[in-house]
Amino acid sequence: MKKILAAILVGIFLVGVSGVALASTAAEATALVDKAIAFYKANGKDKAFAEFNNPKGQFVKGELYIFIWDLTGKVLAHGTNEKLIGKDVSQLKDVDGKLFVQEGVDLAKAKGSGWVDYKWTNPTTKKVEAKSTYVKKVDDLIFCCGIYK
């Protein structure tokens, strides 16, 4: 009986820990966006975008990285994939057909900030996973950082 109770308690603990890990990752994503916005305001667009596009810079932290869209869904900066810079990704769909970039643009324009949920291939696991991207509008830019759940 004690072994069963111990196993149940371990299971409850692990579920609780995974929830905390997700919350801290979401907090890290929003903090990275806020840090990027502060850097942009302090240093201007050119210097900020050069740093955002640097895969070894201060705005790429493990799986977290900054990317910037304009108000139409064009990529202006990307911390891990420079090939996307200048591309209109507004019509990009996830595996379920969701126009998640357009949803993010619409959300940022309407509310200023928020989270967009969609499914995307995790480059680490190579599997389609649930992902959430935090978007925040500043001037005519949308600062973004995503997390896998």
For the regions a language model picked out, list residue spans one by one.
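N-terminal membrane-sensor/transducer module of prokaryotic signaling receptors
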Residues: 2-149
